[in-house]
Regions:
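Short, hydrophobic/aromatic-rich segments at coil-to-beta transitions
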Residues: 49-56
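Enriched for short, Lys/Arg-rich terminal
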Residues: 1-11, 19-34, 38, 58-82
Length: 82
């Protein structure tokens, strides 16, 4: 049997985050894509806020504010900046 790769979370954007994506240029989208790949592979990687399950992940001039679901199968992205 072949070795299965780890399950990755599905990324879903709130409307506000989707609008922010539409305003980004190609370089910003490329940086954001790398950050989202990291979050999808490990939804718990971001720093948890003091107020619940909201997490923030920052890397390479990218900031993503998101909420991972309890089972880690879905990541709800609320805010992005690059």
């Amino acid at each position: 049997m072949g070795k299965r790769s780890p399950r990755r979370a599905r990324i879903v954007f709130y409307d506000v985050a989707r609008e922010q994506l539409e305003a980004m240029n190609d370089a910003e989208l490329a940086r954001l894509d790398l950050a989202l790949d990291i979050i999808a592979a490990d939804p718990q990687i971001g720093v948890q806020s003091k107020n619940g399950s909201v997490r923030t992940y920052q890397q390479d001039r990218v900031r993503v504010v998101y909420v991972p679901t309890a089972l880690g199968t879905l990541v709800l992205v609320a805010y992005v900046e690059a």
